[in-house]
């Protein structure tokens, strides 16, 4: 029996080896490394899919996109009905990646966390990302720390019922934005 073909970006492979002592090094060394700068088409026989490097939540983000029916597997770039974890995020890239995934035609989005999303849900998520950016900019202008701003932060109207796994996520998100904005 043949083994499955493993595809991954170089960043993903390196991260797996670096962060996981039990990583299956034999499999990782045999994995086909896909281009991190441009989409890769994978022919599945009766259809194909596109693997698109996205970067944002982490440097190794990808989306997997199918055209008929229109489906986008978003990974951790999208947390539907949940406040995202910005632990390794570069916020401007996260926002850009999510906007670029959004399609003009009706699409089912499969997030890394939360229920399936449609265009309206993606719009709410983008609004949330923008809201966090705005709160971060205001906090910087006021000379606040990320922790102070995180304590003060509230979800936008209409999203109050979104799940928050960790109350520290607000400060983490604002801190990620502050780091990026101060480095600019």
Where are these regions (language model features)?
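Active-site HxH/HxHxD metal-binding segment of metal-dependent hydrolases
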Residues: 1-41
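Short coil/turn connectors at secondary-structure junctions
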Residues: 2-3, 30, 45-47, 67-69
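Amphipathic, soluble alpha/beta structural segments
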Residues: 11, 56-58, 183-184
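Accessory terminal helices/loops
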Residues: 15, 103-105, 116-184
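Detector for Asparagine
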Residues: 20-21, 80, 85, 166
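Short, charge-rich amphipathic segments
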Residues: 20-37, 61-71, 109, 160-164
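Metallo-beta-lactamase
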Residues: 41, 48-138
């Amino acid at each position: 029996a043949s083994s499955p073909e493993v595809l991954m970006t170089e960043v993903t492979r390196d991260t797996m080896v670096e962060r996981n002592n039990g990583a299956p090094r034999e499999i990782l060394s045999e994995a086909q490394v896909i281009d991190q700068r441009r989409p890769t088409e994978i022919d599945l026989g009766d259809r194909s899919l596109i693997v698109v490097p996205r970067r944002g939540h982490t440097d190794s983000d990808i989306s997997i996109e199918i055209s008929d029916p229109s489906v986008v597997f978003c990974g951790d770039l999208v947390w539907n009905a949940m406040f995202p974890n910005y632990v390794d995020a570069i916020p401007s890239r996260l926002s850009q990646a999510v906007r670029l995934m959004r399609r003009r035609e009706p699409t089912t989005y499969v997030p890394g966390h939360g229920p399936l999303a449609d265009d309206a849900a993606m719009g709410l998520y983008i609004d949330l990302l923008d809201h966090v950016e705005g709160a971060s900019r205001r906090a910087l202008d006021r000379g606040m720390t990320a922790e102070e701003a995180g304590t003060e932060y509230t979800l936008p109207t209409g999203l109050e019922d979104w799940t928050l796994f960790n109350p520290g996520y607000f400060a983490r998100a604002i801190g990620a934005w502050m780091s990026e904005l101060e480095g600019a």
